[in-house]
Amino acid sequence: MPRPRSLSGWTMAVFGLLAASLGTVGLAAPDALVAVMGLAPIPGARRAAGDHTTMFLTASSMAALNMGVYYLLAALADWRPFFRWTVPFRLLTCAVFTSAVLVGRAPEALLGVGAWEGLGAVVTGLALRHERRRPGGGPLDRAVPAS
């Protein structure tokens, strides 16, 4: 079975596996995903008419599954430019989710998701920096997906 070939690849693989797993849980059992986030699930029978929560859970779960698969494939190809591109966007996600909680637009449970994104970005960024500084590391742009 293929495995990531670099420290930064491993950070991406772990993040990808978690994202794909949580996306799958959200598609198969949305209330279980809500509970994992520390929120109280509301059974479908008690939802108000016009409540589109399950639609948004389905959409975000599908996005998480897709993103997780992209991250896993990039990790297996050791596609470091992709790893580098994710760092600022994951930091942005952390900032947006944290801000949403601070202004009262989202429950505190979203802080965990923001922290996960922020920590993942920092760990991946540090791994990329370490790899670039070691002998023979060279520019990250040299790394291209394996054929």
Tell me what each language-model feature is.
Residues 1-19:
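Cytosolic juxtamembrane helix and N-cap/initiation of the first transmembrane helix
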Residues 21, 95-99, 119-123:
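Transmembrane-helix signature of multi-pass solute transporters
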Residues 89, 116-118:
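Residue-level micro-sites within transmembrane alpha helices that shape
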Residues 74, 100, 127-130:
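Alpha-helical transmembrane segments and their juxtamembrane interfaces
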Residues 27-43:
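Short membrane-interface helical motifs at transmembrane helix boundaries
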Residues 118-142, 147:
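Membrane-water interface at the C-terminal end of transmembrane alpha helices
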Residues 17-27, 43-75, 87-95:
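Core segments of alpha-helical transmembrane spans in multipass integral membrane proteins
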Residues 76, 82-85, 95-113:
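Membrane-helix boundary connector in multi-pass membrane proteins
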